[in-house]
């Protein structure tokens, strides 16, 4: 994520910008800030745009780039001021209007965002993203009016998880997350053929599980979207996680104790730690959290990836398996505002909450995982990943037993 900003001289390459159309300037600006990482440091972007303005003049494209960087830096008021000025110059530019709506949403300004979405849709009536986000915002606003003063939430903290052939470790996963504070599990089974159903039925608290068996082209995105649409008013918080992810508090006894410190925040970014195989060829006899104790180093690229704990009644649109667009601003575990991009944050924090991502497990389990594919719809060309993707993540550099403070109680629960 420490992407270097190129030299300013590389931006214009000797061309007079006044002779270029706006689209070409925009392309050059995008190339100037290009990189494989989606979220370079926003303060560096802001500084570089200001330097470009000083050297080349006040182009609208520079202003838009600066507003985008201010959004990444969570200076939504600063971004909004620039975008409002751009709207005066380009009242029918749906790109500018959309960015303004995003700034308003992050400020919690629902009515302002509603008005901007209407203008954006007038400029781009066929945009599926705009239509979906506008409809989601209306649902959030209507629910807030409909249920004012009424608490219909049955659960404090629920997990939403898409599963397939996870019978080996699912019982441990359920017991573990109940132990750290989860009240309910919304499980979407995408056509399991192993003992997954029997494992779920063996869980001693069946009332804690809502189970959906779906087949074919259902996939994770549709599962999570269904959960949001169906259960958005049933839980105070929902964590959207996978069956190989163990979310827990590093110090507190209960995740809800950490969430209580965050006040009315609508969404929390919780970061991965990626664990390797510990050299196991076959599935070990012990529990997952006691068998896989070695992980990648802190600066491993996947450790910038986050998952979300969200107040589901604030979700405007489900953007990505790792994040949602919400009414309000994401925060880190300590309440620091953050604007994730593509499920990543530049400065991950893990002193209070963390996700141990047991991605590879043993080689035997890794091969099974690759065979069943990603939680995507059948026929998706991205469903089966190359073997190299897995082997690159089998990192065992650091011994980390933080999660094992829950091990004695977890064993008691599993053993009955």
Where are the regions a protein language model picked out?
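Catalytic-site signature of metal-activated, phosphate-bearing donor transferases
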Residues: 222-225, 249-416
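Register position in tetratricopeptide repeats
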Residues: 38, 72, 106-107, 136, ...
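Residue-level recognition of tetratricopeptide repeat
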Residues: 34, 68, 102-105, 136
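A conserved acidic beta->alpha catalytic loop
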Residues: 189-199, 205, 216
